[in-house]
Amino acid sequence: LLTEIAVVVPALQYFRNVIPLNETFMADITARAQSCGYTDFFNKYTTSFPPPGPIPIPPDSLLPGCDLYDDIYNAIYYMNPCFNIYHLTEYCPYLYDELGFPSLGGGPSNYFNRSDVQKALHAPIGTDFYECAGGPNLFPNTDQSIPSGLGPLPSVIERTNNTIIGHGLLDFLLFANGSLITIQNMTWNGYQGFQSPPSSTMNLFVPYNPSLDYILNIVNNAIPNTPPQHDTAGAGMQGTWHTERGLTWATLPLAGHEIPQYIPGVAYRMMEFFFGGGSRI
């Protein structure tokens, strides 16, 4: 609820140039967010550093007219049937995906069903695997675990003093502002939430890779019949980061739900920071 419904309308408004739903729908969904209490909730708990106190449960989405996420989700798919909630800037046709997920454009072969991959992973060879598989044996009574922000995560931060939460801004399943509110409701190492606001300017730097010049040359000179390029990733300022009391929070404009899939350079940089490679990302 917190990472979806309470923050979905501000996210939709932010991405109007990518998700241009009609004015009538936008006016209706904005008015409903206000009447259901989501707007005031969002404005209060995304701007208070330190937080004013324990953050209450968001307004109930089961109240009439307050299930905003599902209404927005359906409206987007009518407009763009190839919409990907894990990476909101995708359009038709479906992108080819060797993993078969999260796009619906799965390729002719499933990477996880390759026998050499299964052997390398010590997985049973010949089993029909696919990414993020569900099924009756996976949480048959739903996942009963306590939300991490209400239980184990503060303890993990205190025990390690080296915890990173990264959030792609192109994720339309979980929203960065929802995760930030969750952080603001956690107490760790003696204080609740971040005591100062995270950076509002890009400050997460990824070093440049020589392969970028090679790819730029191919593009600028329209060189034909070049082999596929796999060994590169974006560089420069790739997001924002903020650290307090052993917790680092990073927001990443070019990533969706899966950070290593969309911006692998940032993923490696975060791992380097995690293992002690410098005092900043």
How would you describe each model-predicted region?
Residues 1-281:
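Terminal and linker regions of secretory-pathway proteins
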